[in-house]
Amino acid sequence: LTACGTGPMMTFHAGDVQVVRGVTNELIERLMNKGFSPGHIFDTTGYTYTVTPFSAEGMKLELEDMMAEAGVELLYHSVVCDVEYENAVINSVEVYGKNGKRCIESRMFVDASGDCDLAFLAGLETNKGREADGKCQPMTMNFKVINVDTDRVKEYIMNNNDEFPRLKSDLSKVTRAPKLSIGGYVNTLKKAQKTGKISFQ
């Protein structure tokens, strides 16, 4: 969430009903209290029910605070590099960080690497991608643009709604949204591809 620029979290709702709460919603409330998130707002891209924008830097700070409050010892810039296990039970993991290697013993380990690092090192069977060819979903590639005239963007959307097919059912979302996220410019993109200004598959 904080490293890849994926923007908002989606979604905490199924229609009008909030279905995700717990510690995740506690995090959002804390972010809102510090001005790092507007909270749950309706989705203007048309992908889902609601989105929850947040400041990546603000979230880093708040997650760190929550960990400190819970008594968690954080190991920065560290990765698991080896696992000691016996009879399908992990006894310890070896972590490599800025201060070298460190052995950590525990009765329980949770693999939160996102890549099955711990499971793989422990000899468990892991799979990558879809069964047919092992290919994975393409990663989202985002970048930030500053000093955008959002009023002009909204005006363009309202006057060129064929460029934004996901918004056709309710263009009023564009003017009502506290934060604007859109998927579109489809004709502009096709024209740029056709003229060779951009090229991708």
Where are the language model's segments positioned?
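Core beta-strand elements of the Rossmann-like FAD/NAD(P) dinucleotide-binding domain
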Residues: 97-108, 113
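Rossmann-like dinucleotide-binding core of oxidoreductases
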Residues: 2, 9, 118-201
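Glycine-centered loop/turn positions within well-structured domains
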Residues: 91, 102, 116
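General beta-strand structural signal in soluble alpha/beta enzymes
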Residues: 74-76, 111-112, 120
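Short, solvent-exposed loop/turn segments at the edges of secondary structure
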Residues: 88, 113, 136-140
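Conserved N-terminal/central alpha/beta ligand/cofactor-binding core
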Residues: 1-82, 86, 137
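Short, hydrophobic/aromatic-rich segments at coil-to-beta transitions
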Residues: 87-93
